């Protein structure tokens, strides 16, 4: 409601909006300032505005489209690390993002199972598996980590001779 009021969106235009979404609304002021006042159809607003239609079940669609919670595929063996493809791992660095996009494919990700304080476990697993050539830093948004934290993490990964690439997702 606060965002709609800030944008001068009339109540009658707000039909179909989910005012208590499972995936919280998170919009920085700088982003909100770029949304066209009074326009419920503004594309920037539609990216972040939760609609009741999000709660409708659609055949063929699943809560975890990347199957990142599927233990049978090897997920969850090391906290903070997803190892879906040969030679590549994805490290969860932070659960946070600066904005909650409605198309987020990790909105149901079990971040409580992948805590940043467990990064040493993930680094240990990467160090032991010399088949890993690429580490993808993801989350949330890894760039929300403080400068010292992300620099130290990149240094730690860079010290592993078998890792050839570090990507930030």
PLM feature segments, named:
Residues 1-83:
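Flexible, acidic/Gly-rich N-terminal and inter-domain linker regions that tether
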Residues 35, 48, 52, 95-97, ...:
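Generic hydrophobic/packing signal
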Residues 61-66, 70-92, 99-169:
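Conserved Radical SAM active-site core
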